[in-house]
Structures are given as C-alpha cells and as structure tokens.
Amino acid sequence: MFPTHVLLIVIACVTAFVYGGGGKRPRVCRYSSDGPVCRTNIECSDPEVHCYRKPGHPYGRCCVKRPYACPRGSSNRYDDPEGFPPLVQRCPYAYPFFCRPGYYCRTKTGGSTEFYGVCCPLRVG
C-alpha cells in the first residue's frame, strides 16, 4: 500500500486538477491575449484597450478593442498588436514604415480614413 503522505498528495493533485481546470485558465479576451488584471478601463491606460469583465466577475482583463484587433486570415482569429500586453503600439497611417519590420499599420476601419492605427504583424501565407 502507498504511504499515507503520497496518497494525500495524489488526492490533492487530482482534486486541484478537476476543480481548477487542470491549471489552464480560460481566456477572457476575444480579440487579443489577456492583458493585465483590471476593474475599470482607466486601469488599462490605453485608448485602444478596454477592461473586459465577464458577467458576475469582480475583475476583468485589459483586452484590445475589436476595431483595433489584428485579424489573422478568415478564421475569426486575431494576433496581438505590437506592444500588447500591456499597451498597443500606435502608428500614423500616412507613414507605412513607422512600424518595425514584420509589422504594418492597420487602422480601425482598415482604410485610409483614420489617421492613427496600430502596428499589426504581417502574416505571409
């Protein structure tokens, strides 16, 4: 038979796995990675980022707003803008080389009517 302390450790680990989701926390943000913990938009310190809280939760996460998300193909998946988390790297749309190599300046509408955008990663293929 197992020693008692080994059995207790196994029971504790199995219980933590079952009730804790196996150590994997579900994502809060839909259009970016989860940013820092927050309660209000002010705590996120970025106009392109807001505090998203699931209903009934006292805390949320700083998330990139959908208009500033970086789409990844047509599968409704998104990449993080440069600098996020915690902050988004903004860029003047009129200057296409403002973002570092491997990134492009994307406005919230995806067109030239917006002056500022965010630096999104280029995806080839």
UniProtKB/Swiss-Prot annotation:
Which superkingdom is the protein from?
A: Eukaryota
What does the UniProt keyword field contain? Glycoprotein, Secreted, Signal
What sections of the sequence does the record tag as coiled-coil?
Answer: none
Its GO CC terms are: extracellular region
The listed locations are: Secreted
**What tissues is it present in?**
Expressed at highest levels in mantle, followed by adductor muscle. Found in the nacreous shell layer (at protein level).
In its record, the post-translational modification comment is: Weakly glycosylated.
Position of the signal peptide: 1-16
Note the SS bond partners: none
Q: What is this protein called?
A: Upsalin
Q: Which organism is it from?
A: Unio pictorum (Painter's mussel)
